Amino acid sequence: MTKLWIALPFVLLCAFAGLAQSETTVLDQSGQSVAISLPVETIVSVHGIGTYYVYALGAGNRLTIAYYVGLKAVSKASAAMLRWEPRLPEILSFGDPNIEELVASGAQLVLADGSQHEAVAEQLRELGIPVVLYHAETPDELKEAVTLTASFLGPDAETKADAFIADYDRMVDAVSDDLASLRPDDRARVLFIGTSSTRVISNEMYQTDLIEAAGGSSVSSELFGSWNEVNLEQILLWDPEIIVIAPYGPIQPADILENPDWQSLDAVQSGRVYRMPRLIAPIDTPVPESLLGIAWMAKVFYPELVTLDLAQEVVCFYADYYQFTLTDEELAQMTRP
């Protein structure tokens, strides 16, 4: 009996040792090495893009405070988004990150924007809170960001990350195969505009990569930086065949199609002015949903050549990565030109 009581503490010690936290070190997209205690059970995301990486990898329930790209009030959220994330009224945040609020949240880990939040990251690290910084503005950087996120979320997340990357590559390859016989000069010339009719993308923006993956050519590819303001004269010189409007902001196709100053454009004369659909995240940004942006644009650009089933791609994406079943109306919204 004495031997049993002597042995018992060692048995318990070994049992609790198995429950102890481990640690991993990751290299974030700013080049910083970040030590993270595992398992990560509570996450704050002040990066509206990075938030969606967490959801797509099956860990959205670990978010305690979250930014959502383009969303600054619950009242602006779609019915679909509120149905997808019922906790949105409790966890939504926006604006400049509040250090005191982030510390008080008790989060194990903060996800932040590498182009905006370096000072915030430094302050939090000094307080002992690890921060992962993201910078994803190309397809390769998006896939890298998803893989990075999975590396601290666990094996199930890593499996989902591999599946997502395979799906993204499959989408790009399928469109490329369908358009293999298309000559470079026959590629659709596309103007992509943002929150005003003269606010256009540059060559350094993710939207340019999406257009190219969908088989098009951006007429504003000579520009650099972020969004550029141009004049109507420049747009008339470009004379795009297709105009795509970002899925946010006030601009609608009718604003261009019915504007007398735009009537000489090829895109207007043929009626090929479209606004991208949006259900949850804007699909022109480097979020996982952007693979649907490729599919949607490819079908809009080349409806007779691209053979992928857009409806099936939409249904499968939301089911597989967001665990979300679309209504018939939502599916129609995401598949109409």
Predicted regions and their residues:
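Proline-aspartate-enriched helix->loop->beta-strand connector
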Residues: P89-F94, N98-S115, I129, N231-Y248
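Positively charged n-region of N-terminal signal peptides that target proteins for export
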Residues: M1-I6
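Solvent-exposed loop/turn segments at secondary-structure junctions
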Residues: I49-Y52, V69-K72, L109-V110, S115-E118, ...
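Extracytoplasmic substrate-binding proteins
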Residues: V26, S33, A119-R199, S220, ...
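Sec/Tat signal peptide C-region and signal peptidase I cleavage site
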Residues: F16-S22
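Bacterial N-terminal signal peptides
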Residues: A7-F16
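A short, structured surface patch at a secondary-structure boundary
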Residues: S45-E101, L109-G114, V219
